[in-house]
């Protein structure tokens, strides 16, 4: 296996669907792409508006870098060359990466634009299996027609068998199928044979929708969604984002209320509901209406802001000043009223 790089045609066209390049040993070389077949190594012949392709539209510069090739694209056209839908300035070189989309001509989507679209890919293959381009035309004389496309053929005495007998799947098809993104482009790549019979069209492959005909297993139930259905009526579920699990929602630690106006009986308790509620939670009573709090000795705070705390045992509301605890302590720990503490001790 030798390092090579390929240009795979996307969409329709009258040229070859797959070009494989294996530069000769040395510092590097240059390959030309354009509409002049006698000057270029890759002939660009779009089905629509061939005038958008220049005689020498672009050049591929290959330089040796370790065991691989560093390939750059240079634009020489009048209509433009794009790499991944970004126009390349005329005369500017850009290093290509595996999987880049090359557009020769005006900008537009494949199938609707009179441009040539190719996928650039770096592979390791046997160059003779793909009739790789070795000697570029730019190194030969101007009128020499034999200096452009020189395929690497096997040596004398090597078996001349078609690729279909070497493996169940042709090697060209194996490389093309290794790019997952190409399956969405509905390509019809050509496989090459060394027996001299020319390119062969592979059998038409079915679309992804036709291949997956077996019924798939039903997706597992989302436990998070079922938990949200149970707690759908709580205020916490309307405030907390759906991406957070229910266990991360703050359970009960907003029972401490500091209000300028007396709290109203509206609103539900925060947190997960009890499985066996012992009593219905009671909201703090309104100012001036009955007993201010459930403390045996209510001191009736006269401040503008009154702090309330709810017992975690009996759900009864108390003034923070009446039960003798601090606001910070009520926020950080569970609060039990004197009656509940006596019940726990007994």
Curated annotation (Swiss-Prot):
Potential transcription factor that may play a role in the regulation of genes involved in cell cycle G1/S transition. May bind to regulatory elements of genes, including the promoter of the transcription factor FOXO1. Residues 138-147, 250-260 have a biased composition (Basic and acidic residues). Residues 31-88 form the FHA domain. One of its GO terms (molecular function) is zinc ion binding. Keywords: Metal-binding, Nucleus, Phosphoprotein, Transcription, Transcription regulation, Zinc, Zinc-finger. Its main location: nucleus. Residues 136-168, 190-289 are annotated as: Disordered. A zinc finger (PHD-type) spans 294-343. It is found in: Nucleus. It comes from Sus scrofa (Pig). This is Transcription factor 19. The modification Phosphoserine is found at residue 78.
């Amino acid at each position: 296996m030798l390092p090579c790089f390929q240009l795979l045609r996307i969409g329709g066209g009258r040229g070859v669907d797959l070009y494989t390049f294996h530069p000769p040993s040395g510092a590097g070389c240059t390959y030309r792409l354009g509409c002049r077949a006698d000057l270029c190594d890759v002939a660009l012949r779009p089905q629509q508006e061939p005038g958008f392709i220049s005689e020498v539209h672009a050049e591929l510069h290959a330089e040796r870098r370790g065991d691989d090739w560093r390939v750059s694209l240079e634009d020489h056209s009048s209509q433009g060359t794009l790499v991944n839908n970004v126009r390349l300035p005329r005369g500017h070189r850009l290093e290509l990466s595996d999987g880049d989309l090359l557009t020769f001509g005006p900008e537009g989507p494949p199938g609707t634009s009179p441009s040539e679209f190719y996928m650039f890919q770096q592979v390791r293959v046997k160059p003779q299996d793909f009739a790789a381009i070795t000697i570029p035309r730019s190194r030969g004389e101007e009128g020499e027609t034999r200096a452009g496309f020189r395929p690497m053929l096997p040596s004398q005495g090597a078996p001349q068998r078609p690729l279909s007998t070497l493996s169940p799947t042709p090697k060209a098809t194996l490389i093309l199928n290794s790019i997952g993104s190409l399956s969405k482009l509905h390509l019809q790549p050509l496989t090459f044979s060394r027996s001299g019979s020319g390119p062969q069209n592979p059998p038409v492959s079915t679309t992804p929708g036709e291949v997956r005909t077996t019924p798939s297993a039903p997706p597992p139930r989302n436990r998070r969604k079922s938990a949200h259905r149970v707690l759908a009526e709580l205020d916490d579920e309307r405030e907390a984002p759906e991406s957070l699990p229910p266990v991360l929602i703050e359970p009960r630690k907003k029972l401490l209320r500091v209000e300028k106006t007396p709290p109203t009986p509206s609103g539900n308790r925060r947190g997960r509901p009890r499985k066996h509620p012992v009593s219905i939670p009671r909201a703090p009573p309104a100012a001036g209406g009955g007993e201010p709090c459930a403390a045996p000795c209510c001191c009736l705070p006269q401040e503008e802001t009154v702090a309330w705390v709810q017992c975690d045992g009996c759900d009864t509301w108390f003034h923070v000043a009446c039960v003798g605890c601090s606001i910070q302590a009520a926020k950080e720990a569970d609060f039990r009223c004197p009656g509940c503490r006596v019940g726990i001790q007994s």
